[in-house]
């Protein structure tokens, strides 16, 4: 069986890294911007494979040094697509998704795996997703998006992640998505022993109350204050589980401790809820940094499950078969792209083969206009639309992303 190597970009503190290593990949390179997260990677991986810096800087990552690597993987920044944010997509200086896709055209990895937040699956980004699929198809890859839930892989947390997997044409027939492994344990089942570790008498009763999986762990960003477990809605969900979400504790509850809501979680407890096993990963930095590293990570069990399926495909295990891939995310985008010219409402209807309500056309053009240049022309009888260039950063030297990155680097996480 061949040795499989991965180049991981925007690697964070290593949730995906650990999962991929468990799946049989070894790291050729892991790149991370945050100093503390990079220190965590060095502590747990071979230190010489970790680089700290902006992954889009050629002096940090030279794609030509990694031609034909088995897997290119990463958890590129999520704010451009976050439901909690402005969903700027290609207009967001932090958007590296399109850049990572274009990296495939240079590095020619045998497989690509990128994960992001659920927001990228929303209708707002249908054109963006379609562009990504079409570009990868042009490069010789079969690509597919899939919304996966961490709780389906034993992680005691409500954590949906939107994952893109692409494989070169000869490997694609051997890939299948991982199947759910069964129900996840509750927060109480997961943390009871840690809550009782220092002798707190209330651990048994607390565990009985914490009888569901956790809400999504939110790592947050450097722009906001100390560590806590999320916005108001999440705090209410934590309170129902008997957890005080207003901060992170330094130690488990002590004998005789009484709580109005319940105890706070420690970083070790949060790591368990994210799918880490005790002692298998050491986090560097102060408490707030460690919490953010853990909270922003891709749960290792999910990364491992996907990684094993990618490994099997690259080894051409089993019988190859044609996959039914959902490759049509935005037919209006495709019609405009294939035309390359101005199209009216009626022309678009003929192109997609169905009626298009005026509100649908208006919304789609508005959404496309946030990720692409869209020209409009008021003709004698009807408005016409023409799709222009993609706005996203794909490595262009003169792109505004470079200036904005330098200006706001300390706030990016």
From Swiss-Prot:
Location of the SAM-dependent MTase C5-type domain: 4-317
Matching entries from PROSITE patterns are given as: C5_MTASE_1, C5_MTASE_2, SAM_MT_C5
Give a Pfam family name: DNA_methylase
GO biological process terms, semicolon-separated: DNA restriction-modification system; methylation; negative regulation of gene expression via chromosomal CpG island methylation
Enzyme class name: transferase
Recorded catalytic reaction(s): these are: a 2'-deoxycytidine in DNA + S-adenosyl-L-methionine = a 5-methyl-2'-deoxycytidine in DNA + S-adenosyl-L-homocysteine + H(+)
What is the active site of this protein?
78
**Zinc among keywords:** no
Query: What EC number(s) would the UniProt record show?
Result: 2.1.1.37
Source domain of life is Bacteria
| Coiled coil location | none
Note the SS bond partners.
none
Which key words tag this protein in UniProt? DNA-binding, Methyltransferase, Restriction system, S-adenosyl-L-methionine, Transferase
Gene Ontology MF terms: DNA (cytosine-5-)-methyltransferase activity; DNA binding
- Which family does the UniProt entry place this protein in? Belongs to the class I-like SAM-binding methyltransferase superfamily. C5-methyltransferase family.
Q: Its function?
A: A methylase that recognizes the double-stranded sequence 5'-GCCGGC-3', methylates C-? on both strands, and protects the DNA from cleavage by the NaeI endonuclease.
UniProt name for this protein: Type II methyltransferase M.NaeI
UniProt source species: Lentzea aerocolonigenes (Lechevalieria aerocolonigenes)
**Top-down, what is the taxonomic lineage of the species of origin?**
Bacteria, Bacillati, Actinomycetota, Actinomycetes, Pseudonocardiales
């Amino acid at each position: 069986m061949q040795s499989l190597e991965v180049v991981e970009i925007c690697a964070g503190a290593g949730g995906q890294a650990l999962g991929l290593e468990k799946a049989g990949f070894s790291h050729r390179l892991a790149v991370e911007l945050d100093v503390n997260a990079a220190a965590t990677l060095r502590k747990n991986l071979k230190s010489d494979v970790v680089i700290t810096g902006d992954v889009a800087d050629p002096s940090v990552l030279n794609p030509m040094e990694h031609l034909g690597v088995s897997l290119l993987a990463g958890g590129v920044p999520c704010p451009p697509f976050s439901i909690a944010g402005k969903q700027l997509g290609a207009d967001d200086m932090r958007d590296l998704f399109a850049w990572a896709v274009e990296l495939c055209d240079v590095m020619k990895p045998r497989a690509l795996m990128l994960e992001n937040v659920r927001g990228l699956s929303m209708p707002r980004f249908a054109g963006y997703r379609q562009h990504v699929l079409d570009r990868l198809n042009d490069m010789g890859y079969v690509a597919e998006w899939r919304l996966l839930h961490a709780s389906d892989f034993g992680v005691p947390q409500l954590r949906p992640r939107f994952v893109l997997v692409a494989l070169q044409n000869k490997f694609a027939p051997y890939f299948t998505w991982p199947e759910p492994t069964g129900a996840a344990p509750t927060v109480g089942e997961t943390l009871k022993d840690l809550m009782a570790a220092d002798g707190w008498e209330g651990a048994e009763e607390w565990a009985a109350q914490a009888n569901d999986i956790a809400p999504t762990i939110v790592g947050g960003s450097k722009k906001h204050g100390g560590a806590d477990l999320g916005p108001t809605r999440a705090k209410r969900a934590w309170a129902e589980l008997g957890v005080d979400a207003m901060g992170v504790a330094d130690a488990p509850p002590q004998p005789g401790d009484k709580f109005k809501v319940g105890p706070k979680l420690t970083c070790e407890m949060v790591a368990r809820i994210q799918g880490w096993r005790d002692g298998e990963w050491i986090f560097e930095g102060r408490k707030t940094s460690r919490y953010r590293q853990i909270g922003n990570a891709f749960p290792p069990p999910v990364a491992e499950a996907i990684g094993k399926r990618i490994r099997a495909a690259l080894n051409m295990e089993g019988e190859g078969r044609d996959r039914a891939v959902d490759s049509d995310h935005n037919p209006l985008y495709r019609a405009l792209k294939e035309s390359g010219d101005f199209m009216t409402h009626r022309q678009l209807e003929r192109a997609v083969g169905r009626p298009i309500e005026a509100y649908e056309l208006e919304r789609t053009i508005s959404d496309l206009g946030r990720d692409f240049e869209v020209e409009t022309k008021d003709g004698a009888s009807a408005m016409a639309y023409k799709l222009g260039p993609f706005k996203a950063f794909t490595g262009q030297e003169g792109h505004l992303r470079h200036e904005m990155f330098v200006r706001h680097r300390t706030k990016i996480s």
